Swiss-Prot record:
<protein>
    <recommendedName>
        <fullName>Uncharacterized protein C18H10.20c</fullName>
    </recommendedName>
</protein>
<dbReference type="InterPro" id="IPR024391">
    <property type="entry name" value="LDB19_N"/>
</dbReference>
<dbReference type="GO" id="GO:0030674">
    <property type="term" value="F:protein-macromolecule adaptor activity"/>
</dbReference>
<dbReference type="InterPro" id="IPR014752">
    <property type="entry name" value="Arrestin-like_C"/>
</dbReference>
<dbReference type="GO" id="GO:0072583">
    <property type="term" value="P:clathrin-dependent endocytosis"/>
</dbReference>
<dbReference type="GO" id="GO:0030136">
    <property type="term" value="C:clathrin-coated vesicle"/>
</dbReference>
<keyword id="KW-0539">Nucleus</keyword>
<dbReference type="GO" id="GO:0140312">
    <property type="term" value="F:cargo adaptor activity"/>
</dbReference>
<dbReference type="GO" id="GO:0031625">
    <property type="term" value="F:ubiquitin protein ligase binding"/>
</dbReference>
<dbReference type="GO" id="GO:0005737">
    <property type="term" value="C:cytoplasm"/>
</dbReference>
<dbReference type="GO" id="GO:0005829">
    <property type="term" value="C:cytosol"/>
</dbReference>
<keyword id="KW-0963">Cytoplasm</keyword>
<keyword id="KW-0597">Phosphoprotein</keyword>
<dbReference type="GO" id="GO:0070086">
    <property type="term" value="P:ubiquitin-dependent endocytosis"/>
</dbReference>
<feature type="modified residue" description="Phosphothreonine">
    <location>
        <position position="12"/>
    </location>
</feature>
<dbReference type="Pfam" id="PF13002">
    <property type="entry name" value="LDB19"/>
</dbReference>
<dbReference type="GO" id="GO:0005634">
    <property type="term" value="C:nucleus"/>
</dbReference>
């Protein structure tokens, strides 16, 4: 077999970088505390850096920083229409420099902006993607290029916005199952977190009946479901051609089937089990996006138990059976950390400080 010799290839050296852009965030993670109606927002602050390399100077014609909110529909009604495929909204613009000459070194521009608490959190699934990012655009000229504007340098810095519930005590859900005397009390945390664990406690009473017939538990099942509702409306130009098709999807994130593990004390059933959310694959936290790209993600905990009626008569201790089902809304959000919003961390301003105490004489 003849050998193949590799021929040398001519390579064109790349032009050395004349300048670089960089963004350093100084604020903590962007987390909305509370519902969109009550949240005070999230404060973002950082520094934009411009480093000039291998040039005696550069002439900056424009340096602009924008905060952008972008919605992308992965399966739009009209695939070739950009308006049906999403939207782009500029939330804030900073004009940092214009017609200015800079020598070699690093220049800094601080920036800050308060995200309103009514904005939806970042989300990404197989139907829609909502993202926030910073985009810096630099248009400059170099001495060798006659200080005419060259190809703009663009830096895209993604931001992750999350929403968390304010820490609160556990919630007790009470359900009555007529015509029986059975009553269930389910104690759950106020919110669940992805990749974590939570304790669920169940207490049931009313197993002893007045007619001498008792109820007996055979099986207990619980599952955590994710409900998603999505509807994409076409743009104004295609609204009469295509009708929106709402999509509803349910999937089970975690489940457990128990045939033992509970105990009876004085005709009361006690069950304590753990809801493990660490095995959830790409869970979506609760989020709601308004029209025209409507998305609502919620989570529900379903608790089911099968009870049999047994008669206190010799030779016949099995009777009819019932399935008792409890469905409660169980929020799934990002952990709140210390649960302190940005406005509570700020020191008091001069107007909010009261008068000094009287001096001693």
């Amino acid at each position: 077999m003849p050998l193949k010799l590799a021929l040398p290839r001519s390579t064109t050296p790349k032009d050395p970088a004349r300048c670089t852009l960089d963004i350093r965030m100084e604020s903590p993670p962007l987390v909305f505390l509370g519902s969109p109606e009550t949240s005070s927002g999230a404060l973002a602050s950082g520094i934009l850096k411009l480093t000039i390399l291998h040039q005696p100077f550069i002439k900056v014609h424009t340096l602009k920083l924008q905060l952008i909110k972008r919605i992308t529909v992965l399966h739009p009604a009209i695939s070739h229409c950009s308006a049906c495929a999403g939207s782009k909204e500029v939330l804030q613009t900073w004009d940092l420099a214009a017609n200015t000459t800079y020598r070699p070194g690093t220049q800094h521009w601080p920036f800050s902006w308060l995200f309103p608490g009514s904005l939806p959190a970042s989300v990404s699934n197989r139907y829609i993607k909502l993202e926030y990012y910073l985009e810096a655009t630099l248009c400059y000229g170099t001495p060798e290029g006659g200080i005419s504007p060259s190809k703009p340098e663009v830096l895209k810095f993604p931001l992750q916005l999350k929403r968390a519930a304010i820490p609160s005590p556990d919630t007790i859900h009470k359900r009555i199952f007529p015509p029986t005397n059975l009553v269930a009390n389910i104690t759950l945390p106020s919110t669940l977190h992805p990749h974590g664990a939570a304790l669920m406690e169940v207490t049931m009473t009313g197993f002893a009946q007045n007619d001498g017939n008792d109820w007996k538990i055979n099986r207990v099942t619980w599952r955590l479901e994710e409900h998603m509702q999505f509807s994409c409306q076409p743009c104004e130009r295609h609204r009469d051609l295509v009708k929106p098709r709402p999509i509803e999807e349910k999937r089970i994130l975690s489940t457990q089937d128990l045939q033992s593990g509970w105990k009876f004390i004085d005709n009361q059933m006690f069950l304590s089990t753990q809801i493990n959310t660490s095995s959830l694959r790409e869970p979506s936290c609760d989020v709601e996006i308004p029209a025209p790209f409507s998305l609502k993600v919620s989570h529900h905990l379903i608790f089911e138990t099968i009870v049999n009626r047994k008669k206190n008569v010799a030779g016949n201790n099995m009777g009819n059976a019932r399935i008792l089902r409890v469905s409660v809304v169980q929020p799934l959000t990002t952990p709140a950390g210390l649960g302190i919003s940005w406005d509570e961390e700020c020191p008091p301003v001069f107007e909010s400080v009261g008068p000094a105490p009287p001096a001693y004489t």
